[in-house]
């Protein structure tokens, strides 16, 4: 009755399962009894009948079982494939109407998916504004904020009325002190031809961008993005647009982007091209710990039913499908690992190419029956979706409830997630946005907040001077640990060699330091220092490539060259750039013809020279970088470098807070603090806060208690609350009685003691550790009495200061080695000393260098370094299959990697023990970011004097006799 009898069918299936035959007979009887129609269906799980074994393996992968498990889930018999019409007719020959009824059902189903239409939510403009008018109103306000220029909106034009400070105009070349001249009047500024010309550059660019945005129907898009970005800014959530969106003046004026596209020569057409009708794509980085707040705002503004995160599907690649199929077949880890490692290390390679390129894999496939079965199954499952998860950043916003447009599901936390991936969501014309999380923005915010607390200075990183010499000095010394995009060893070396003097230089280095263009770096450095005469294939390329010393680094340069030399529109030049990047031969031939003809027509350039330039553009387009993206990140890099140069304590504290959960990174940052003369004091229950923070008394950072392994933020907050409500803790009993016992449990208390955070409580660590049970028990008893409103039986005796510490409570302190081991485990660094301190005299007299100086040695030179093994990673070489060991050797300055393989592995493997002290003689490898040492000899550190002492000199004063 609900659906109408004509729309109600009884479903019949026949997969050779006996129970189905029983069910089908009953369904046929019901159909006769109640006058219902039947329809024959087929439960399809794989396309071909021969794929049943592969499907069985896939079920095992999903249920984490093995094929030989008789109790596992399975689809038996092998009948769940896509049958032909003839097969279905034969299966249901007793009820032929059930087969023909499938056509009736199909005709009743009507789903039309409209592609090519936009379904963006409509932004509701304030009263008295159209959407277009409101966007122009916001842009006029942005003109004043960014350029101190009063602009009036007149229809579709922006009219400049006042220029408060002409020096804020990016193309103004007049006096820097113009606004301070006694006769300067802002309302008369446009009468000055230089000021008028500089203002015109901005208004014409804005008119042009708005024309394209309106023509393509994206006004609501920019209002929506501008709205949630503005919400973020009002809430103090740092954000920055990445990618080609930074090339738009509109995004800059709406404060979506922080990059002035006029100053940095960025192109709008690289972002939004009227000749390539694609929706705009603005990727925005938010401070990673506040990103969820902005997503929640969009849910509240547009409705929870209209906003969802986008699903993503993990597929099985060549290596992973071999591992998965091998596991369900019951093969050993070693055997599966052997086969997987035969697949070349190429993320895009498939099994067919792997068999062509890997002789070992081909031989195993041809000669080993089990391997052939595994790979034949893997062929069927390769690229099949293995799992569904939530995209790290992508969000879709619809104009109506999303369940009307696409399939949805709930994630583990109850959030709404699409069952379509990113591209199909875009094909449906829905608004998809990337809300990305960037830790660096959290670091910048936290650093500025600390500067406000410690120095009373309100910092706005968007207003920092971009010509600060201290900042460039820091970069050029290679002191870039913690500096966004510039902190790798290779980047530090590049900064030192290049000598940065502007944000444009940082932009170039960020663009070059990638596979492909890295080969250009040595020549780029020589050109920077005037060691190479810069020549241009054509004089018209000089203004385009002058900024990058005659080398094309950016995609935008390719576009400008096509525009200036061959008369392309910038939109057409963007199509050329894309064609060059995709290397489509036929399209490239068409563009070459257009380019050569355009060069001749516009600039009378001969065909031979035009073809030469085209070849050059084609070469650079293959690896050219998006300048808008590079400039956006270069500014963030500069901001972090500025903060580190001027506020090192606050910056390093913010960095350490950011990496509290990463012991390896914390160790690097603590070492960096040491190099900068900043002391990192150990945790202290009376002094530390949740996070790392500047301490009183100069260049000092206090270790954050939440960074102690096993403690956690909840417990630390309870400690801080108790501390703020009273005085400092005086004893372990005092600590336990004042802090909520539900947070301060045994494991937390033991971690605090072993890390040294309770050293201020009057007893050594062994004694404190021994009192844990007593203190927690006494605290629990007192808390229970208080909750009942009772006074303790012992009254004042239960006050912490009155609890007597007996002689039996006073234990002998743990050995220094035990304390150091606990500190390293819980904090990531040593507090009470260093295990190598007893060997300091050996390191001083018998080491020829240390972990800090090895990077300065010539490549392939010999050296001798002593230290202690802090980590060992063992494995098998992908080339030879032989074992190797990667040893992290720690000395008093830091760590260095020791790669031991071949005969040296067998000779010295007995020395590979954690905390073992060694002297290593070997060859330096400085070819990669991090120096390595290939050892020729290893020996126990204590044997170094006997091995390397050649002479002993005795000096005996004469008066001894």
Predicted segments, located by residue:
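Prokaryote-biased recognition of long, low-complexity C-terminal linker/tail segments
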Residues: 417-421, 667-671, 762-959
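Alpha-helical scaffold/interaction cores of sigma-54-like transcription cofactors
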Residues: 1-797, 873-876
């Amino acid at each position: 009755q609900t659906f109408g009898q004509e729309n109600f069918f009884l479903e019949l299936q026949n997969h050779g399962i006996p129970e189905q035959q029983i069910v089908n007979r009953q369904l046929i009887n019901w159909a006769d009894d109640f006058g219902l129609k039947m329809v024959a269906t087929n439960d399809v799980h794989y396309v071909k009948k021969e794929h049943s074994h592969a499907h069985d393996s896939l079920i095992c992968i999903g249920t984490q079982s093995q094929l030989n498990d008789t109790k596992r889930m399975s689809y038996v018999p092998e009948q769940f494939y896509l049958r032909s019409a003839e097969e279905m007719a034969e299966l249901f020959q007793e009820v032929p109407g059930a087969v023909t009824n499938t056509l009736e059902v199909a005709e009743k189903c009507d789903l039309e998916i409209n592609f090519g239409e936009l379904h963006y939510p409509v932004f509701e403009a304030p009263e008295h504004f159209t959407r277009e008018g409101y966007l122009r109103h916001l842009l006029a306000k942005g003109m004043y904020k960014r350029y101190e220029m009063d602009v009036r909106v007149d229809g579709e034009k922006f009219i400049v009325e006042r220029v408060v400070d002409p020096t804020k105009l990016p193309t103004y070349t007049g006096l820097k002190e113009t606004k301070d001249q006694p006769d300067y009047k802002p309302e008369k500024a446009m009468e000055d031809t230089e000021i008028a010309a500089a203002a015109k550059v901005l208004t014409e660019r804005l008119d042009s961008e708005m024309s394209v945005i309106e023509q393509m129907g994206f006004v609501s898009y920019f209002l929506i993005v501008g709205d949630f970005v503005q919400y973020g800014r009002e809430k103090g959530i740092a954000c920055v647009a990445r990618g080609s969106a930074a090339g738009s003046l509109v995004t800059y004026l709406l404060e979506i982007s922080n990059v002035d596209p006029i100053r940095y020569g960025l192109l709008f057409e690289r972002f939004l091209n009227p000749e390539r009708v694609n929706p705009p794509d603005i990727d925005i980085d938010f401070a990673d710990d506040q990103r969820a707040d902005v997503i929640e705002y969009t849910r509240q503004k547009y409705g929870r039913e209209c906003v969802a995160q986008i699903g993503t599907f993990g597929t099985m690649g060549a290596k992973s499908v071999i591992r998965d199929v091998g596991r369900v077949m019951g093969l050993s880890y070693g055997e599966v690992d052997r086969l997987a490692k035969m697949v070349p290390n190429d993320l895009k390679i498939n099994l067919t190419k792997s068999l062509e390129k890997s002789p070992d894999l081909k031989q195993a496939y041809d000669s080993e029956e089990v391997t052939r079965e595994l790979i034949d199954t893997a062929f069927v499952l390769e690229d099949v979706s293995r799992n569904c998860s939530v995209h790290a950043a992508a969000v879709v916003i619809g104009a109506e409830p999303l369940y009307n447009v696409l399939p949805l599901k709930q994630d583990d936390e109850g959030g709404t997630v699409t069952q379509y991936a990113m591209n199909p969501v875009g094909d449906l014309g829905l608004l998809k946005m990337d809300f990305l999380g960037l830790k660096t923005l959290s670091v910048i915010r936290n650093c500025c907040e600390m500067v406000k607390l410690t120095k009373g200075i309100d910092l706005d990183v968007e207003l920092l001077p971009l010509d600060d010499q201290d900042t460039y000095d820091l970069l050029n010394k290679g002191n870039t640990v913690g500096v966004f995009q510039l902190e790798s060893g290779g980047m530090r070396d590049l900064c030192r060699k290049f000598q940065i003097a502007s944000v444009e230089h940082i932009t170039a280095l960020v663009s070059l330091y990638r596979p492909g263009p890295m080969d250009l770096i040595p020549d780029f450095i020589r050109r920077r220092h005037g060691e190479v005469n810069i020549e241009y294939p054509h004089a018209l390329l000089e203004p385009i490539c002058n900024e990058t010393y005659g080398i094309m680094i950016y995609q935008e340069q390719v576009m400008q060259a096509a525009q200036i030399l061959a008369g392309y529109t910038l939109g057409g030049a963007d199509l050329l750039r894309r064609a060059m990047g995709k290397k489509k031969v036929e399209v490239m031939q068409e563009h070459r013809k257009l380019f050569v003809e355009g060069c001749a027509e516009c600039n009378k350039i001969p065909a031979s020279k035009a073809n030469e330039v085209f070849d050059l553009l084609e070469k650079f387009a293959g690896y050219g970088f998006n300048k808008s993206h590079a400039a956006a990140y270069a500014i963030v890099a500069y901001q972090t470098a500025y903060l580190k140069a001027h506020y090192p304590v606050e910056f390093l504290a913010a960095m350490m807070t950011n990496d509290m959960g990463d012991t390896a990174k914390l160790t690097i940052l603590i070492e960096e603090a040491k190099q900068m003369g900043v002391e990192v004091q150990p945790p202290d229950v009376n002094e530390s806060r949740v996070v790392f923070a500047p301490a009183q008394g100069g260049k000092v950072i206090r270790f954050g208690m939440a960074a102690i392994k096993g403690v956690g933020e909840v417990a630390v907050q309870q400690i801080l609350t108790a501390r703020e409500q009273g005085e400092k803790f005086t004893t372990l009993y005092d600590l336990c009685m004042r802090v909520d016992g539900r947070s301060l449990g045994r494991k937390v208390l033991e971690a605090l003691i072993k890390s040294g955070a309770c050293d201020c409580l009057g007893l050594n660590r062994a004694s404190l550790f021994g009192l844990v049970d007593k203190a927690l028990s006494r605290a629990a008893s007192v808390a229970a009495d208080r909750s009942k409103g009772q006074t303790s039986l012992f009254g004042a005796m239960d006050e912490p200061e009155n609890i007597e510490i007996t002689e039996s409570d006073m234990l002998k302190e743990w050995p220094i080695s035990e304390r150091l081991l606990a500190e390293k485990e819980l904090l990531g660094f040593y507090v009470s000393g260093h295990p190598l301190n007893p060997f300091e005299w050996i390191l001083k007299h018998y080491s020829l260098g240390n972990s800090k100086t090895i990077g300065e040695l010539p490549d392939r030179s010999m050296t001798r370094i002593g230290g202690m093994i802090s980590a060992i990673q063992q494995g098998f070489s992908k080339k030879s299959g032989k074992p190797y060991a990667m040893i992290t050797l720690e000395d008093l300055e830091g760590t260095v990697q020791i790669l031991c393989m071949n005969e040296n592995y067998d000779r010295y493997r007995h020395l590979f023990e954690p905390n073992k002290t060694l002297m290593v003689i070997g060859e330096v490898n400085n070819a990669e970011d991090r120096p390595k040492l290939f050892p020729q000899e290893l020996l126990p550190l204590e044997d170094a004097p006997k091995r390397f002492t050649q002479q002993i000199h005795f000096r005996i004063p004469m008066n001894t006799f």
